[in-house]
Amino acid sequence: AALAVVIAFCSASQDIVFDAWKTDVLPAEERGAGAAISVLGYRLGMLVSGGLALWLADRYMGWQGMYWLMAALLIPCIIATLLAPEPSDVIPVPRSLEQAVAEPLRDFFGRNNAWLILLLIVLYKLGDAFAMSLTTTFLIRGVGFDAGEVGVVNKTLGLFATIVGALYGGVLMQRLTLFRALLIFGILQGASNAGYWLLSITDKHMISMAAAVFFENLCGGMGTAAFVALLMTLCNKSFSATQFALLSALSA
């Protein structure tokens, strides 16, 4: 249990540092693409450390061997970290808890309409998150698909669609303003859930389910790319780690 806590602590700390680094190092015009790539990496990491790791541990390697393999996969990440460029702006390191936590919060809440910004952050992905939490139950109990069918479609096609959506969203954000991307992708996120309504009023068919899951995850990936770019834009580079951690925690 103690080892699990240490691993989780280190993982969360590394996540915060990475979010702060990408916020500091990426110029405004590259944040959409950067957000898309970070979503891609996150989803691939979920796939490798989740379903693939469970399958390999059960069939071939056992848990000890699996953890050694997962540790080895971190070596390229360490090399990439050593080669990564430093941010161009030199920012003083916080020397007290007040500078590290209190000042970033004062800076954020001192902005105009700070509470409206927080409301947007909380609500932007909320409906999509609710819908996704109900999807599996709806497809099994509401429509009548079996758990195996739903699992295969959600874990393979759904993951693939999320990755494609994030990358496509990043490409589109090179041509759209952040506001337009958030608006269009947000509307698509909401509209994509209509596919499940169609499933409820039509005959059960595997292709129909796959299409609904694909479209919903595609639009969700596009929305996630725009949303991460928004969080990066809202952060003051002097306080990027604390502010990104705060905003991402609220969105979760």
Q: Which positions does each model-derived feature cover?
A:
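A late C-terminal transmembrane helix in Major Facilitator Superfamily
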Residues: 238-252
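Glycine-rich segments within core transmembrane alpha-helices of 12-TM secondary carriers
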Residues: 32-53, 57, 248-252
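C-terminal transmembrane helical hairpin of 12-TM major facilitator-type secondary transporters
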Residues: 179-230
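Intracellular juxtamembrane helix-capping segments at the cytosolic ends
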Residues: 12-26, 221-242
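C-terminal membrane-cytosol helix-exit motif in multi-pass small-molecule transporters
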Residues: 72-90
